[in-house]
């Protein structure tokens, strides 16, 4: 039986056309996805020329997690026209992965050759501190799922662009790097699971980004991943974890994170 759902690429093209029509911009060359806790950083990126509810775009599903606005902004940064996705949906909200990665595919269809994927993450390394931005050097997809269907054998050797990471370090030479472990959520990890992740080589842990990275690379875009350490992972401090803690850490770091993103994007 034929799949009655729209073709993902066609749906992305439809969304891209609406974005172009509503913003008056034929192509946006950079896209930014703001993760949990990153929403307050929007103000530091610059003034948007257009703000669209994501629910008005073909294929987009409004996010339900706290700290995700569900808006798409068109923002000029330096010589670039940037699509800012203020909020993302997660697989743990019950969505098929084709909808989770649809915003990235739509941004690519709208012209974005660079995807800046941000997230909130738990820190697993002793040298990582709450409020610290960390460049993602690689990831562990521990969700047991892929957004790709069929014979799409995408090379992920440099899933997170070394070129873009070097540009980010030109903006802030103190930026650390780490391996991000993507888990399904929505529950936080147990201390035993954190010890397992450390053994596997993870430095950061969260519930997003890995599927978007795979979809972006499959579409031919470069990816820069940036985690904001919003808490130390389970068992490290002995304190319980909460989403409120994540949002508070993001709010406290908002100006710095927004300024960092704006400066890095201007260097692209």
UniProtKB/Swiss-Prot annotation:
It catalyses: a purine 2'-deoxy-D-ribonucleoside + phosphate = a purine nucleobase + 2-deoxy-alpha-D-ribose 1-phosphate. CDD domains: PNP-EcPNPII_like. The keyword Transferase applies. A purine D-ribonucleoside binds at residues 189, 231. One of its GO terms (molecular function) is purine-nucleoside phosphorylase activity. Keywords: Glycosyltransferase, Transferase. It comes from the Bacteria. One of its GO terms (cellular component) is cytoplasm. Its EC number is 2.4.2.1. NCBIfam families: PNPH-PUNA-XAPA, PRK08202.1, PUNP. This is Purine nucleoside phosphorylase.
């Amino acid at each position: 039986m034929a799949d009655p759902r729209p073709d993902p690429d066609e749906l992305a093209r439809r969304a891209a056309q609406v974005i172009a029509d509503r913003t008056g911009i034929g192509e946006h060359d950079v896209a930014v996805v703001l993760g949990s806790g990153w929403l307050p950083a929007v103000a530091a990126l610059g003034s948007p020329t257009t703000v669209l509810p994501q629910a008005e775009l073909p294929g987009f599903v409004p996010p339900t997690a706290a700290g995700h606005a569900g808006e798409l902004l068109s923002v000029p940064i330096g010589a670039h026209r940037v699509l800012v996705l203020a909020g993302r949906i997660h697989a743990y909200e019950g969505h098929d992965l084709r909808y989770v990665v649809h915003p990235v595919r739509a941004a690519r269809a709208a012209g974005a050759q660079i995807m800046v994927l941000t997230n909130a993450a738990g820190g697993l390394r002793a040298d990582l501190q709450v409020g610290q931005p960390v460049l993602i050097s690689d990831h562990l997809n521990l969700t047991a799922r892929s957004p790709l269907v069929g014979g799409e054998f995408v090379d992920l050797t440099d899933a997170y662009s070394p070129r873009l990471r070097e540009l980010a370090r030109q903006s802030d030479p103190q930026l650390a790097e780490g391996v991000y472990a993507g888990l399904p959520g929505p529950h936080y990890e147990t201390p035993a699971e954190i010890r397992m992740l450390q053994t596997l080589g993870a430095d950061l842990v969260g519930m997003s980004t890995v599927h978007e990275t795979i979809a972006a690379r499959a579409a031919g875009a470069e990816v820069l991943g940036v985690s904001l350490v919003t808490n130390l992972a389970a068992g490290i401090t002995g304190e319980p974890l909460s989403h409120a803690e994540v949002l508070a850490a993001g709010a406290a770091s908002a100006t710095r994170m927004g300024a960092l993103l704006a400066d890095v994007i201007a260097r692209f």
